[in-house]
């Protein structure tokens, strides 16, 4: 068996091409040259036709003058000789074949087949150009024939000068068009040059400063779009740097603790080392397992955040009732001492199934974590209008203070009271990211306003539609909320109580 192997492909050669400036300038020159050529031909044709028509009119007028004067009949020889003092050649042929001629010096009136046809009476009139002369032949009523011609050399001299003038003017026009096209192209492509320099600067120095925008034309819009790209790139780098910094900080603590415990276990197992009490060994092993679980959770949260930032998601129809059921089953396995009150309607969201499941699970985990043993967690999915439904997860825990409500959706934020609890500070940040990516909004309320404890209710509004086999009336809108900024203390709520905080996709994206 003979085998063939394809050799390596030759690298593609970069084809050299003219710059945009040269292409625009050559295009302008070509267009101007085309217009100049067309106009030159038109001018030449019009002037040439006018000059030849004027010669024909002169010959016709001279013939009519001779005929009308009657001199051709009274004294034809004298009448023809009189034309010698003008700029025409003349010939009179009588029926008896007597011929009278008068020519200009150095010229002879040409007689060809058309003129002979007029003399024989076959044609009444003939006009033609021959031997640098314009010849007119007319058959008269008395049987005579009058032939008159005029030299075209003066006319041809004028046409020669006209051709030279048109050629010079056309050449100057093309040259001016080239210079003007180059100047206009240079001025018009100056913003493109600035964009090129900015792109090279970004690639060379990571400088993401915006480019000044001049005017309001298409190039100005291109500059604005490039500035938007620079801002998005700067924000992406800032998020990446912040994520790496925060992740490193959050990973350092469990890794240090895990390393300490592992080293202690390894040291106790070396020959001759004192043995740790069994109770301490069990505690160390439990700590190691707990720290590994904490690291796994933290890494999973970081992966989810990175996945959401990159937009690598697959959108599909998602049944939120199934999402709630699956998430609730997982939470119940971890907290079987909590009572869950569930009221769910059929609702379909077109989005990321994994992201929506993670958001619902994080809300339920958060509510279960802060609920005391034997506490109750409410889970309610209700339809608000034909295109929106709301998932409300509430608990009867200690609640969230108004000052901290503005920070709980930020990455790695953990309140003072939450630092003693397990968690990475990424759960609600993931919820916020998922909700905003689906065009929804979040709202935090007290479960029991003014209660002790007040509890926490997190409301997740999602666009979608009822399931095909569901028809649920819209729930009454019994609570009014005021959207406020969730970025920190600088965006304080206008209401002093700050009992409610909300964030939606539009306000978040506007930032």
Swiss-Prot record:
Histidine kinase domain boundaries: 246-466
Annotated catalysed reactions: ATP + protein L-histidine = ADP + protein N-phospho-L-histidine
Residues exposed to the Cytoplasmic side: 1-26, 185-511
Listed InterPro entries: 2C_sensor_his_kinase, HAMP_dom, HATPase_C_sf, His_kinase_dom, HisK_dim/P_dom, HisK_dim/P_sf, Sig_transdc_His_kin-like_C
Post-translational note: Autophosphorylated.
Keyword Transferase found: yes
A Pfam family recorded for this sequence: HisKA
Matches recorded under CDD domains: HAMP, HATPase, HisKA
EC number from the UniProt entry: 2.7.13.3, 3.1.3.-
Cofactor(s), names only, from the UniProt record: Mg(2+); Mn(2+)
Membrane-topology descriptor: Multi-pass membrane protein
Keywords annotated in UniProt: ATP-binding, Cell membrane, Hydrolase, Kinase, Magnesium, Manganese, Membrane, Nucleotide-binding, Phosphoprotein, Protein phosphatase, Stress response, Transferase, Transmembrane, Transmembrane helix, Two-component regulatory system, Virulence
UniProt domain HAMP: residue ranges: 186-238
Region described as Disordered: spans on this chain: 468-511
Gene3D superfamilies, sorted: 1.10.287.130, 6.10.340.10, Histidine kinase-like ATPase, C-terminal domain (3.30.565.10)
Bias-annotated ranges (Basic and acidic residues): 476-485
Residue numbers on the Extracellular membrane side: 48-163
CC per GO annotation: plasma membrane
UniProt-recorded Gene Ontology molecular function terms: ATP binding; phosphoprotein phosphatase activity; phosphorelay sensor kinase activity
Annotated positions of the Phosphohistidine modification: 249
Polar residues bias (residue ranges): 491-511
Location(s) in or outside the cell: Cell membrane
Biological role stated in the UniProt entry: Member of the two-component regulatory system MprB/MprA which contributes to maintaining a balance among several systems involved in stress resistance and is required for establishment and maintenance of persistent infection in the host. In response to environmental signals MprB acts both as a membrane-associated protein kinase that undergoes autophosphorylation and subsequently transfers the phosphate to MprA, and a protein phosphatase that dephosphorylates phospho-MprA.
UniProt-recorded name of the protein: Signal transduction histidine-protein kinase/phosphatase MprB
Encoding gene per record: mprB
């Amino acid at each position: 068996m003979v085998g063939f192997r394809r050799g390596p492909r030759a690298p593609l050669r970069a084809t050299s091409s003219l710059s945009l400036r040269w292409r625009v300038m050559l295009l302008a020159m070509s267009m101007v040259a085309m217009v100049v050529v067309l106009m030159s031909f038109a001018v030449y044709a019009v002037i040439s036709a006018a000059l030849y028509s004027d010669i024909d009119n002169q010959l016709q007028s001279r013939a009519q003058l001779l005929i009308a004067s009657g001199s051709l009949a009274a004294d034809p020889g004298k009448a023809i000789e009189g034309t010698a003092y003008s700029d025409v050649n003349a010939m009179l042929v009588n029926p008896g074949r007597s011929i009278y001629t008068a020519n200009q010096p150095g010229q002879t009136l040409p007689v060809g087949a058309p003129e002979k046809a007029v003399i024989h009476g076959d044609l009444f009139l003939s006009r033609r150009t021959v031997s640098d002369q314009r010849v007119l032949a007319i058959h008269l009523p008395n049987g005579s024939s009058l032939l008159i011609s005029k030299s075209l050399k003066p006319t041809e001299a004028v046409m020669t000068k006209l051709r030279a003038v048109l050629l010079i003017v056309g050449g100057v026009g093309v040259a001016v068009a080239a210079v003007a096209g180059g100047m206009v192209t240079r001025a018009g492509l100056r913003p493109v040059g600035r964009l090129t320099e900015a792109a090279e600067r970004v690639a060379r120095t990571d400088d993401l400063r915006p480019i000044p925008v001049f005017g309001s034309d298409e190039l100005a819009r291109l500059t604005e779009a490039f500035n938007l790209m620079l801002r998005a790139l700067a924000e992406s780098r800032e998020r990446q740097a912040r994520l790496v910094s925060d992740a490193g900080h959050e990973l350092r603590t469990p890794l240090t603790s895990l390393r300490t415990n592992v080293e202690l276990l390894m040291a106790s197992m070396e020959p001759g080392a004192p043995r740790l009490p069994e109770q301490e060994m069990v505690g160390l092993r439990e700590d190691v397992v707990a720290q590994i679980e904490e690291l796994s959770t933290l890494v999973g949260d970081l992966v989810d955040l990175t996945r959401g930032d990159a937009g690598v998601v697959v959108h599909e129809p998602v049944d939120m009732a199934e999402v709630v059921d699956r998430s609730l089953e997982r939470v119940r396995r971890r907290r079987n001492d909590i009572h869950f009150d569930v009221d769910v309607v059929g609702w379909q969201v077109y989005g990321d199934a994994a992201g929506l499941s993670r958001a619902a699970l994080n809300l339920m985990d958060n509510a279960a974590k802060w609920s005391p043993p034997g506490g109750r967690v409410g889970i309610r999915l209700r339809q608000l209008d034909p295109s929106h439904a709301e998932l409300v997860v509430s608990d009867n825990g200690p609640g969230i203070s108004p000052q901290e409500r503005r920070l709980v959706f930020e990455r790695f934020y953990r309140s003072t009271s939450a630092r003693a609890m397990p968690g990475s500070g990424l759960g609600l940040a993931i919820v916020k990211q998922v909700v905003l990516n689906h065009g929804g909004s979040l709202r935090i309320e007290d479960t029991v306003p003014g209660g002790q404890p007040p509890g926490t209710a997190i409301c997740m509004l999602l666009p979608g539609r009822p399931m095909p086999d569901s028809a649920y009336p819209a729930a009454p809108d019994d609570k009014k909320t005021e959207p406020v900024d969730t970025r920190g203390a600088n965006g304080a709520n206008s209401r002093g109580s700050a009992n409610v905080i909300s964030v939606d996709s539009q306000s978040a994206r506007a930032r």
